[in-house]
């Protein structure tokens, strides 16, 4: 398996896996019209190209034999979805294709985020996770994340609650 940093030429493949993994994760527990509105607004080709070109955001694919298994999106500084300190690093998205869940791929991507945080001498890694995504919450707790707040996440017309979790990044 390899982790590869993306650039704007990866936008089509990023859009494809972003939509697929978001649907696999959430479509059974949300209304289709809310899902579609979110996908249209947040995972459009134009939006993803813009995010790929933002110097304060980074995307990574995890690949095996040229197949994308999942991806990671990190935000630094002003790209963070909450107004946290500059020494925080946000995991905005970490998604794995359904067929590859339970194979430690999420842990590999999480370790990549921690490695980047260490290299940039950042203090905390943080994320928002839907309060009903129990599998993800358990994963983050198992990996040392602690709850520190909440924020709203809008999926179409549905205003949901994300739990905010953070992990102190140990210095090199």
Explain the meaning of each model-derived region.
Residues 8-11, 15-24, 28, 36-99, ...:
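Acetyl-CoA-dependent GNAT
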Residues 97-99, 103, 131-132:
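Active-site acidic-Proline motif in GNAT/NAT acetyltransferases
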Residues 102-115, 138, 142:
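Conserved acetyl-CoA-binding loop-helix of GNAT-fold acetyltransferases
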Residues 95, 145-146:
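Short acidic-aromatic loop segments in the C-terminal HATPase_c
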Residues 1-2:
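Extreme N-terminal starter segment of soluble prokaryotic enzymes
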Residues 85-89, 123-124, 130-137, 141-143, ...:
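C-terminal "cap" of GNAT-fold acetyltransferases
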Residues 103, 120-123:
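Short coil/turn segments at alpha/beta junctions that flank glycine-rich nucleotide-binding fingerprints
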């Amino acid at each position: 398996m390899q982790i590869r940093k993306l650039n704007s030429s990866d936008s089509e493949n990023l859009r494809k896996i972003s939509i697929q993994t978001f649907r696999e994760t959430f479509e059974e527990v949300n209304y289709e019209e809310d899902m579609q509105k979110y996908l249209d607004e947040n995972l459009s080709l134009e939006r993803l190209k813009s995010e790929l070109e933002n110097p304060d955001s980074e995307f990574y694919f995890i690949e095996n034999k040229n197949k994308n298994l999942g991806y990671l999106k990190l935000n630094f500084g002003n790209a963070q979805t909450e107004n946290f300190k500059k020494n925080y690093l946000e995991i905005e998205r970490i998604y794995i294709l359904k067929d590859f869940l339970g194979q430690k791929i999420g842990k590999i991507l999480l370790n990549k985020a921690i490695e980047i945080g260490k290299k940039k001498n950042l203090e905390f890694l943080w994320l928002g996770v839907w309060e009903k995504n129990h599998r993800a919450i358990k994963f983050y707790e198992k990996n040392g994340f602690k709850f520190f707040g909440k924020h709203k996440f809008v999926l179409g017309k549905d205003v949901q609650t994300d739990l905010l979790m953070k992990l102190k990044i140990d210095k090199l």
